[in-house]
Regions:
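Catalytic-site-adjacent helices and loops of nucleotide signaling machinery
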Residues: 1-17, 39-40, 172-176, 185, ...
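C-di-GMP signaling machinery
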Residues: 90, 99-145, 153, 182-189, ...
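The catalytic core of metal-dependent phosphodiesterases that act on cyclic dinucleotides
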Residues: 236-312, 326-342
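Catalytic core of bacterial c-di-GMP phosphodiesterases, primarily the EAL and HD-GYP domains
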Residues: 156-161, 188-264, 339-340
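A short glycine-enriched loop-to-beta-strand structural element that forms part of the catalytic core
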Residues: 37-46, 70-104, 110-116, 215-222
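Alpha-helical scaffold within the catalytic cores of cyclic-nucleotide enzymes
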Residues: 20-25, 53-71, 95-98, 196-206
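Active-site core of bacterial EAL-family cyclic-dinucleotide phosphodiesterase domains
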Residues: 125-182, 220, 281, 338
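Conserved long alpha-helical elements within nucleotide-processing catalytic cores of c-di-GMP signaling
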Residues: 1-25, 36-40, 44, 52-55, ...
Length: 342
């Protein structure tokens, strides 16, 4: 109603709400239900559920609004949550109806939405994951492990990759697959990645100060990081803060970031190279337009995704594909890291 009030005035907006309330009161009496006003521009009604009745209610509410909008087309939306007759009516039903109404508001073609349990469960799981992760982050239960990169000819550890790990309250490790998508969607992954980057830089500095051997460590950069912050500047600041040569901090960017944000990634890789950092294309072969991208992108190393690694004794397509990829990389003078060979 905010936009309606700006165009037609608060008084006219109040008349719309009064007319909608009258319509719902009439339906309440006719259906032996209960109607109410939630505040702002939200109403609710509890009646026996029938699909035809739902659309009849919507049409009557729409007609009440249409009398006031001068043909501009302010379309109300309605979220419907059917209640199991064997279950007690609780505030949970209201929350589900409000959740469903958000979908209706975003659908300019179909303004009536029926509750979908799977959508609600996904949304609930999303917020639960974020909440629990933030608690774990505050409690110091977010850390990283270093996965070694080994020279296949000599067996020497020549590098490592910093992999984020969430330690559960019981000490178990929670797979990144279960929480990284939610962090990327919410944007919290930027906070996480900066935390991991700084942790690795501090660890490298500590080993150098103790006279211990160090190897370059790969730091993962997501598409969200690229859009949300100046990654090259941040990496340069970390290297300066911990007095590290940039060769010790390798920057891994997923192939999906290359394909989805090619201009931003091109600029980032150029800035990183200017500052002395090397760049890896992670998950090579899992995105789109891989061959065309290799021709244009300025990358130092490619990492083949573990899905291409042949199983024991597999000399079929997987082996042929990975052989072709290695030959292609060699012809382009690109070093290759293969995941999952262990």
């Amino acid at each position: 109603m905010r936009l309606f009030n700006e165009w037609h005035g608060q008084a006219e907006g109040d008349r719309v709400l009064a007319d909608v309330g009258t319509v719902l009161k009439d339906i309440e009496n006719a259906e032996m239900g209960v109607a109410g006003y939630w505040g702002q521009d939200d109403f609710c009604i509890l009646i026996p559920f029938e699909h035809d009745t739902v659309h009849q209610i919507y049409n009557r509410v729409r007609a009440a609004v249409a009398k006031h909008d001068d043909g501009v087309g302010f379309w109300p939306s309605m979220g419907v949550c059917p209640i199991d007759p064997n279950e007690e009516i609780t505030i949970d039903a209201q929350a589900k109806a409000m959740f469903t109404n958000r979908r209706a508001k975003n659908d300019f073609k179909e303004r009536v939405a029926i509750f979908r349990p799977e959508e609600y469960e996904r949304e609930t799981a999303f917020h639960r994951t974020l909440t629990e992760f933030q608690y774990a982050f505050s409690d110091g239960r977010i850390t990283y492990y270093l996965q070694p990169q080994v020279d296949m000819e000599t067996g020497e550890i020549v590098g490592a990759e910093a992999l984020t790990r969430w330690i559960g309250k019981d000490g178990s490790l929670i797979s990144p697959v279960t929480f990284i998508p939610a962090l990327e969607e919410s944007g919290f992954v930027v906070t996480l990645d900066k935390y991991i980057w700084q942790g690795v830089a501090s660890w490298l500095r500590g080993r150098i100060d103790r006279g211990l051997r160090v190897v370059p460590v790969s730091l993962n950069v997501s598409r969200v990081d690229i859009l949300a912050c100046d990654v090259a500047e941040h990496m340069g600041a970390l290297a300066a803060q911990y007095n590290l040569p940039p060769e010790l901090m390798r920057i891994e960017i997923t192939e999906t970031a290359y394909t989805g944000e090619s201009e931003a990634v091109d600029k980032l890789t150029a800035d990183l190279h200017t500052r002395g950092f090397s760049t890896y294309m992670d998950d090579f072969g899992t995105g789109q337009s891989t061959l065309a991208m290799l021709k244009n992108v300025n990358v130092d190393v490619i990492k083949l995704d573990r899905t291409f690694v042949p199983a024991d004794g597999d000399q079929g397509r997987s082996a042929q594909i990975i052989t072709s990829m290695l030959d292609m990389a060699q012809s382009l003078h690109l070093p290759v890291v293969v995941e999952g060979v262990e």
